[in-house]
């Protein structure tokens, strides 16, 4: 059998390279991974990208890009529609296509290719079920062929590779050996001898054969997978389609689809296959997959030799990898972090396989004659072999000899293929060498020119080198000087260490004192607790004493209640006497009420009569006056408005005749007329106001009458007070007399006020008159000013305005007459108001005489009543004296009981005072010193820290010891010229690491010595610089002490140290 379809291309075809399509599918976590708490470290971040992490919290990620990536939630139908569905059309067009699943064991390869469900006749390649790619592809092919309505045949085969042994899963004879041979007619293809291809006609036939193959396939249970595939399988589908050619000749189109399910790579320890046959299976599986990886690497690197023959698996897939087949790879991986190494290996191989290029070619369409001829030749060949075997007249060889010839032939073919590949590789290498030679020739010319430039630069560099050597010598000397400085600092550090130990000893002593102080505080706390308990006990005793005092108070309260009842009885008796007195008083009150009612009735009648007459006269006079005045005002207003309208009409006629000349005059004249109207209207309003003021002036008369009525009401109130205050009748009578005299005085005062109000009204009338005269004057002045203005305008204007001036003069005369008329009417109104007030004054005099008569009569009656009531009050006083004597006795008894109770309470308080003294003297504890509390002391420790001498002094002495007279002893080690800067920087880089570290110690000015900063070795200043201490506010700090030990604080007043010694100053 030919795995590639067994057809050769006899016509030249257009070849185009095509990369292998690579897909990745990530399965979800299974139950085993959930049990071992394996975390997901693989993420599908896009339709084409996969990101992996070594651990869940790792920030280092690796991203792979493929043609398509499927996440854990992807379905079987999604994978098929993307990967295999496009290949079905290519198969029907006559291409050979291959799809194989690659990955670690237990990642879902068999699930993807075969599925977990058994395919049924009603199953469709588009439904959402767990059937795999193989049954979906067969169903899809049958559906497409049925819709094409062509004649076709379909044959399938199911090949298994187990422990490098081939097996036909659909064959009924297990003894048949299957071999692989290279196809001499088609380079890169193999022929599988002994593999049975079974024709199928429906989906049912295919599903039955597929189930048969699944049952015969080698599977086993491992720790990684309950049904782990222990072999590789290749499911091949060959489709022959009959179609008519251009000349009407029958043509046969052949397409082939290989669906490969590879066994997964395994780790022996993880899978639990350390013993037995499983070890051999694992070794063979891993060996074949390793060879597949090497083939992929060789194809990607375009190596001259691809190791197809090192494994039967790679020989089966030879045409699919780098051949004439359209190939797709599905890489299945696990998302758990326990399998991250295998996952990364699978992703890297799959990512590398993307670069493999195939050259897909359409299988040649064969005519019916060609097919029959091939079949006839093959039948004749088989017949001859059969006859030779029967007749035994052919060439017979020993089995060993035949085996040697076969092996020799295979080795020669293998060697020939290798030589051909080697020759091709040598040719490619020769082309590369020629290309390199041309490039080298071109670069040689460029290098020659560069060499000349380099020689010139060399001469310049030699001069620079001499200068650099000098700088290097100086730099080495400076290095030694810095080394000497470091040694001085080390000596200082040793002294500082000794001082630090002394300070730590003082700190330990202070710590011990602190612990003893804490013990003292604890003892005082315990003493406070005892005092608190004593206070609680004292509180309980005092509470008992207070309860006893409360009991005595309750007893005293009961005694007071009994006395209260006795006093209540006496009060009842007194109330009986009071009731009798009240009865007598009520009779007297009734008599007084009758007398007061009579007096009140007389006063009320008199008051009503007076009010009626006054109001009648006032209403008649006011109404007549207002009506007359309003009628006159309305008549005058109508007359004035008519006259003004007439004058305006005349003026308007004149203006129409002289419109062009009198526009400005018309506006001014209209303004004057409007002001006149406004003054007339304001005058009318003021007249209304004056009338209202006159009406308001009549109101005081009504208010005086109202006051009289209120005085009568006061009389009634006084009578009621007499009824309520019979217990002090005599005093009330005197008060009534006084009030009546006051009322008489107030009535006379009110009459005087009425007289004053009359005079005030007369004055107001005079003011109104003067106001009217003022308005008259204002009107005359306004008219005169208007006349003067109009006269000036007329003189400056046209003669046609003479008539308007005449009208204005008539209006002025009319206004004067109107003012005189208003003055006359106002005088008449003033006279009528005076008559009205005279009448009111007469009525008030009569009312006053009548009120005095009523008052005299009331006084006589009251004197009679007072005498009778005084006799009754004397009798009741004697009865009250008897009741008061009894009440006095009861009060004395109450005082005696109170004295006894007070004595008892005094005794209880003495007991409480004794308890308090006992608590203070015996129970209340005080603190007793133990003698362990530390006393105040002075801690002795170094208060002045050592410091290193100035760097200039150290360097100067060091130079004198070494007798370096060639250097300037007055210069510091940091000086360098500007011209040496660049060279010194290169020289410093050539020093050792120790030298570079030493150069990081800068020199700071000390004791007024100025240190010059250059640009060489003092560029890196850091916090380790030695600085002199500064005494500010009694505190000193040292940079050296900060870098070596914690900072120290000197007490106030400690002297600042001065550096003046050679090496160290204490």
Swiss-Prot record:
Effect on the protein upon substituting residue 726 to K: Mainly tetrameric
GO terms for biological process, alphabetical: cell division; centrosome separation; fusome organization; Golgi organization; microtubule bundle formation; microtubule-based movement; mitotic cell cycle; mitotic centrosome separation
Ranges of biased composition (kind: Low complexity): 1033-1051
PTMs per UniProt: Phosphorylation is required for localization to mitotic spindles. Phosphorylation of Thr-933 during mitosis controls association with the spindle apparatus. Phosphorylated in vitro by Wee1.
Keyword tags: ATP-binding, Cell cycle, Cell division, Coiled coil, Cytoplasm, Cytoskeleton, Microtubule, Mitosis, Motor protein, Nucleotide-binding, Phosphoprotein
Compositionally biased spans, kind Polar residues: 990-1002
Function, in words: Important role in mitotic dividing cells. Microtubule motor required for spindle body separation. Slow plus-end directed microtubule motor capable of cross-linking and sliding apart antiparallel microtubules, thereby pushing apart the associated spindle poles during spindle assembly and function. Forms cross-links between microtubules within interpolar microtubule bundles.
Xref: PANTHER family: KINESIN FAMILY MEMBER 11 (PTHR47970:SF12), KINESIN-LIKE PROTEIN KIF11 (PTHR47970)
Protein known as: Kinesin-like protein Klp61F
Record organism: Drosophila melanogaster
Gene behind the chain: Klp61F
């Amino acid at each position: 059998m030919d795995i590639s379809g067994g057809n050769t291309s006899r016509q030249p075809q257009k070849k185009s390279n095509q990369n292998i399509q690579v897909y990745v599918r990530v399965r979800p976590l299974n139950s085993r991974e959930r049990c071992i708490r394996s975390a997901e470290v693989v993420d599908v971040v896009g339709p084409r990208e996969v990101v992996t992490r070594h651990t869940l919290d790792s920030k280092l990620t690796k991203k792979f890009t493929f043609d398509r990536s499927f996440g854990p939630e992807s379905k079987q139908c999604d994978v098929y529609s993307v990967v295999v569905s496009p290949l079905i059309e290519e198969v029907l067009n006559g291409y050979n296509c291959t799809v194989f699943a690659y990955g670690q064991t237990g990642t879902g390869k068999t699930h993807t290719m075969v599925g977990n469900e058994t395919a049924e006749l009603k199953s469709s390649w588009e439904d959402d079920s767990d059937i795999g790619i193989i049954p979906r592809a067969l169903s899809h092919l049958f559906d497409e062929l049925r819709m094409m309505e062509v004649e076709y045949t379909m044959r399938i085969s199911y090949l298994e590779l187990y422990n490098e042994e081939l097996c036909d899963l659909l064959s009924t004879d297990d003894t048949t050996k299957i071999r692989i041979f290279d196809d001499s007619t088609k380079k890169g293809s193999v022929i599988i001898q002994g593999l049975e291809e079974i024709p199928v006609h429906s989906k049912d036939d295919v599903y039955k054969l597929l189930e048969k193959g699944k049952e015969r396939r080698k599977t086993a249970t491992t720790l990684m997978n309950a049904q782990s595939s222990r072999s590789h399988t290749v499911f091949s589908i060959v489709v022959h389609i009959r179609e008519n050619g251009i000349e009407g000749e029958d043509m046969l189109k052949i397409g082939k689809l290989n669906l490969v399910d590879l066994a997964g790579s395994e780790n022996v320890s993880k899978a639990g296959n350390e013993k037995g046959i499983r070890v051999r299976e694992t070794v063979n599986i891993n060996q074949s997959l390793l060879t597949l990886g090497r083939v992929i690497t060789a194809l990607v690197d375009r190596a001259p030799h691809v190791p197809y023959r090192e494994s039967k698996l790679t020989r089966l897939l030879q045409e699919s990898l780098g051949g004439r087949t359209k190939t797709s790879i599905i890489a299945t991986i696990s998302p758990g972090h326990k399998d991250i190494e295998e996952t990364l290996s699978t992703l890297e191989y799959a990512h590398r396989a993307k670069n493999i290029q195939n050259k897909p070619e359409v299988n040649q369409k064969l005519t019916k004659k060609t097919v029959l001829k091939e079949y006839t030749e093959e039948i004749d060949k088989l017949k001859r072999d059969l006859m030779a075997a029967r007749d035994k007249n052919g060439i017979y060889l020993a089995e060993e000899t035949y085996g040697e010839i076969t092996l020799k032939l295979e080795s020669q073919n293998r060697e020939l293929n290798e030589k051909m590949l080697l020759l091709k590789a040598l040719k490619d290498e020769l082309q590369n060498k020629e290309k390199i030679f041309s490039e080298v020739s071109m670069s040689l010319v460029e290098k020659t020119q560069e060499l000349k430039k380099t020689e010139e630069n060399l001469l310049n560099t030699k001069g620079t080198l001499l200068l650099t050597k000098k700088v290097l010598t100086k730099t080495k000397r400076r290095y030694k000087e810095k080394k000497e400085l470091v040694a001085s600092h080390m000596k200082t550090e040793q002294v500082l260490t000794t001082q630090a130990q002394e300070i730590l000893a003082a700190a330990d002593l202070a710590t011990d004192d602190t612990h003893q102080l804490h013990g003292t505080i604890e003892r005082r706390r315990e003493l406070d607790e005892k005092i608190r308990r004593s206070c609680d006990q004292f509180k309980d005793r005092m509470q008992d004493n207070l309860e006893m005092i409360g009991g005595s108070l309750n007893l005293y309260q009961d005694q007071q209640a009994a006395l209260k009842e006795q006093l209540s009885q006496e009060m009842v008796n007194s109330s009986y006497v009071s009731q009798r007195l009240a009865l007598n008083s009520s009779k007297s009150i009734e008599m007084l009420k009758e007398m007061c009612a009579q007096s009140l009735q007389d006063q009320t009648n008199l008051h009503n009569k007076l009010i009626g007459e006054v109001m009648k006269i006032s209403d008649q006079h006011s109404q007549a006056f207002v009506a007359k005045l309003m009628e006159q005002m309305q008549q005058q207003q109508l007359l004035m408005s008519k006259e003004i309208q007439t004058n305006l009409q005349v003026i308007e006629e004149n203006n129409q005749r002289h419109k062009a000349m009198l526009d400005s005059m018309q506006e001014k004249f209209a303004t004057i007329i409007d002001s006149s109207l406004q003054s007339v209207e304001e005058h009318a309003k003021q007249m209304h106001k004056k009338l209202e003021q006159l009406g308001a002036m009549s109101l005081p008369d009504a208010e005086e009458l109202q006051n009289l009525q209120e005085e009568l009401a006061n009389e009634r109130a006084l009578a009621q007070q007499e009824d309520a205050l019979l217990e002090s009748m005599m005093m009330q009578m005197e008060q009534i007399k006084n009030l009546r005299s006051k009322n008489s005085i107030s009535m006379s005062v009110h009459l005087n006020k009425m007289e004053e109000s009359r005079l005030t009204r007369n004055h107001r009338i005079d003011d109104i008159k003067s106001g009217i005269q003022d308005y008259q004057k204002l009107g005359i002045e306004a008219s005169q000013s208007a006349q003067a203005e109009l006269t000036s305008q007329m003189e400056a204007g046209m003669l046609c305005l003479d008539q308007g001036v005449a009208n204005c003069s008539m209006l002025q005369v009319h206004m004067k007459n109107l003012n005189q008329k208003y003055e006359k009417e106002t005088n008449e109104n003033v006279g009528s108001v005076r008559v009205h007030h005279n009448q009111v004054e007469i009525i008030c005099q009569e009312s006053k005489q009548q009120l005095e008569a009523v008052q005299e009569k009331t006084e006589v009656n009251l004197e009679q009543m007072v005498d009778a009531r005084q006799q009754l009050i004397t009798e009741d006083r004697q009865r009250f004296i008897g009741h008061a004597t009894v009440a006095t006795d009861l009060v004395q008894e109450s005082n005696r009981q109170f004295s006894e109770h007070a004595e008892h309470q005094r005794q209880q308080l003495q007991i409480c005072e004794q308890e308090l003294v006992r608590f203070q003297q015996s129970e209340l504890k005080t603190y007793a010193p133990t003698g362990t509390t530390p006393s105040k002391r002075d801690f002795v420790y170094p208060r002045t820290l050592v410091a290193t001498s100035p760097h200039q002094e150290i360097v100067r002495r060091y130079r004198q010891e070494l007798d370096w007279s060639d250097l300037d002893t007055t210069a510091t080690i940091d000086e360098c010229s500007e011209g040496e800067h660049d060279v010194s920087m290169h020289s410093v880089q050539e020093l050792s690491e120790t030298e570079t570290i030493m150069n990081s110690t800068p020199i700071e000015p000390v004791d007024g010595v100025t240190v010059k900063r250059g640009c060489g070795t003092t560029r890196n200043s850091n916090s380790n610089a030695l600085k002199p201490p500064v005494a500010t506010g009694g505190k000193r700090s040292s940079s050296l002490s900060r870098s070596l030990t914690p900072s120290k604080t000197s007490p106030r007043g400690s002297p600042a140290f001065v550096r003046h010694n050679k090496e160290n100053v204490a």
